[in-house]
Amino acid sequence: MKINLLVLTISAVLSITACSNKDQKQTSQQKTESLETENNIQKSDKKMAKPIHLTKAEFLQKVANYEANPDKWVYLGDKPCIIDFYADWCGPCKMVAPILEELAQEYDGQIYIYKVDTEAEMELASDFGIRSIPTLLFCPMGEAPQMAQGALPKDAFKQAINEVLLKKS
């Protein structure tokens, strides 16, 4: 009887231990996979430059404080930029959005690409006289900005970036 009880106890302890070790192995493997996934996401986020959405307050800090300088354009950025005045419902704006994302990656470190939602930032859009969308404002360093309206093809954007913003012929 004592031998049966001893065998039963040992087998119970072994089965519990075996099951709990299996769970720990799975948990550590899941943690490792989770960390690898997080690291891959963080690495890909660092590589993926994207357009930056601006509010009016951010515009006044990063681009130009036209309230403090109403008579003169003073660009505040350290790199040239493109500002896309858009709306979520606008078909041509939806056509331009992926082009701007590609250009943000292609010209990462050389220019900024900003986006201003005209529905959310009506005052800012009004201050710049935005009547049709998409409207794009090209802001070179040390010069007056240039405005373009409508959905431009990627080569037109690249030409404007190279000639107006980066001064490449």
Predicted regions span which residues?
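Non-catalytic, surface beta->alpha helical segment in thiol-disulfide oxidoreductase systems
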Residues: S132, L137-S169
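Thiol-based oxidoreductase modules, predominantly thioredoxin-like and allied folds used
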Residues: F85, V96-A104, D108-E123, I130
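Structural signal for short hydrophobic segments within the conserved structured cores
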Residues: I52, Y112-Y114, P145-A148
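Short pre-active-site segment immediately N-terminal to redox-active cysteine/selenocysteine motifs
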Residues: D78-C81, F85-W89, S132
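C-type cytochrome heme c attachment motif
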Residues: D88-M95, T135
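N-terminal targeting signals for export/organelle localization
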Residues: M1-L60, S169
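Extracytoplasmic/secreted proteins, especially bacterial periplasmic and envelope-associated proteins
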Residues: L54, E58, C81-D84, M95, ...
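A short beta-strand-turn-helix
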Residues: T55-P80
